[in-house]
Amino acid sequence: MKILVTGSAGRVGSFVARQLLGEGHRVRGFDLKPSGINSPEFDEVVGDFDDAAAAQRASNGVDAVLHLGAFMSWLPADRDRLYRANVDGTRIVLEAAAAAKVGRFVFASSGEVYPENKPEFQPVTEDHPARPLSPYGVTKLLGEELVKFQGRVSPMETVILRFSHTQNASELLDPTSFFSGPRFFLHPKIRQQEGFGNALAVEKLKALDIGEEALVLTRNENGRPFRMHITDTRDMAKGILLALTHAKAVGGIFNLGATEPVDFADILPAMAKKTGLPLVAVDLPGAGVWYHTSNARIRETLGFEPEWPITRMLDEAVSAWTRRQT
Ligand code: NAD
């Protein structure tokens, strides 16, 4: 098969592209940035999803599209770019794929369409109402609608995957990581909260600062530690490849992520023990993050079995962290 992987320079897209090449497929990338992938079976279009000519060049001659690229930002200043990349961009990539008579189109949506941070019931299944509370979540829901529309009006098969939060294991203990830095480390968290303009959170976090880097256990205003899914990129790739090939995936919407959520009350002390970093705890204003999303549908329908629970990811994260210290 020849497969177009959008977001081929990104975390998930670059991994999936390499995996497909390893399985003997031909792969084309499509991203704003070059992927750095070097293989005779790989070519790429460097361009913007909302550039129709680039999208058409990317789609021509491929059997399937994995639309894994998107712009992720929660900053108000990025709003226009967010909608252009994730809504207009997805529409244009979809239309190019349909015009090129692509067989199957797999779309990377997000748990933020529910939203997972404020669920009406748990575990969150695919039947939970989709009522996003962030502009990013809105762009993903609009993307889903565009995918469903194309699935109705063209013969192209479509699959929607609602992604869990996703990390490479090596990112978990990297204070410079876009997600894991502010999630687990005090100094990046202070900078993040300053960026969001959350003065009270900044004040509480700064009061814990002992001048050296520390891990931070985040709890809500009642002292309940955060809980959320964090899924390894390798498990996400397994689910994406099932969506690409499985007959029962067609027309489906599936939550894709780890089976169990990560309890910060468990993982932060384990991180501190394994790294020797100091651990502080903070109660931030608000209800906080505390969710469990069900992956039962993709397990039961497509046979998805994740292999990288957080404990296994953490072992690898500690090795990467130790290497960075020397
Ligand atoms: P990533 O940021 O590592 O990669 C996204 C890629 O898309 C980047 O290489 C970027 O250059 C490219 N891109 C962005 N805007 C573009 C545009 N307008 N035109 C062309 N290329 C563009 O993200 P990731 O972690 O690999 O995420 C993959 C997918 O999963 C995305 O669709 C994301 O929205 C979704 N998702 C990710 C998470 C997560 O926690 N990582 C959670 C839920 C959903």
Where are the regions that the model predicts?
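N-terminal Rossmann NAD(P)H-binding glycine-rich loop of SDR-like oxidoreductase domains
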Residues: I3-E23
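NAD(P)H-binding glycine-rich loop region in Rossmannoid oxidoreductase-like domains
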Residues: G36, G47-A85
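NAD(P)-cofactor binding segment of oxidoreductase domains
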Residues: V65, A77-F105
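Catalytic helix-loop patch of NAD(P)-dependent Rossmann-fold dehydrogenases
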Residues: R84, P119-I160, G181-F184
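Conserved Rossmann-fold NAD(P)-dependent oxidoreductase catalytic core, especially the SDR/UDP-sugar
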Residues: I92-P135
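Mid/C-terminal beta-alpha module of Rossmann-like enzyme folds, strongest
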Residues: R227, D235-P285
